[in-house]
Every structure is written in C-alpha cells, then in structure tokens.
Amino acid sequence: GVLYVDDKGNYWIEEYILESPTHILNGFIWALWGVYDAWKLLENSEAKDLFHKCCKTLETNLKKYDNKYWSLYELSNTYLPMISSPFYHNLHIVQLKIMWALTSSNCFLEFSTKWEEYGLNRVNRVKAILNKSLFKILYY
C-alpha cells in the first residue's frame, strides 16, 4: 500500500497508486492491519501513530461507503458508485467487526451491524447485484 494524506488531513493507505485515489475499503483495512502488526510486534511508535490516524480517517469517512442499502467497494469519482459484490460486502462486515475488536470503536460495530442487515434483505441483494452489473458494463 501507499500512504496518501488528503487535503482534509485524512491518512489513507491506498491499494493502488492512481492520480485520483479511489480509497478501496478492503485494501485500506488489510493494510491497516499490517500497520497494527508492526505496532504490536515491533513496538513501533510510528506505526502506532499511523494506525490511530488511519482509524480516525476510517471512522470519519465510513459513512461515505454506505449507500443506504449496501456497501461501496471504493470511493471513485465515477458517476455511478462502485457497489461491492456480495463477497466484498460480506468481507467488509467481517473486517469492521475485527476493527471493532481491535479498537473498541462503536463506529465499526454500528456499520458492520447495519451492513449485515442490508445483506439479509433480498431486495437489497438483488439491487446491489444489478447495480454492480451495470457498473461493470459502463466502466469496464
């Protein structure tokens, strides 16, 4: 991953180097766990500081990944948002539960619970799959 600090002071770990960062959610969280491991295993204070800054970024911006019926895969600047596939939606839920276990931040628990409820709704699942398919047709 690559560290990117935006104009609002948010610390993002990007999965891909792009001119316009996309903030891929699962990649950010995977990389964040690497920072957490460096902090805990190496007792690295810089890693600890980066972990906390990135957690604050995630807490502040997590609502942007919620489209009111499913999770978004990323925050790209496309007209049509990139909906997560069912696999990645479920991965986001698991990742946020782990983030809650690591940090005790209720924000992570709240979104994991909300997204779990989204996934149990058949209409939401169908809508997400249709939107994901349309996204792929238009952008790939």
Locate each region found by the language model.
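C-terminal appended segment following the main domain
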Residues: 90-140
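A generic structural signal for solvent-exposed, polar alpha-helical segments
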Residues: 18, 36, 76-79, 106, ...
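Well-ordered alpha-helical segments within folded domains of soluble proteins
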Residues: 23-39, 84-101
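Carbohydrate-binding/catalytic loop surfaces
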Residues: 4-26, 67-91, 130-140
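Eukaryote-skewed repeat-based solenoidal scaffolds used as protein-protein interaction platforms
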Residues: 1-59
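Long, well-ordered core segments of solenoidal/helical folds
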Residues: 1-6, 45-70, 110-127
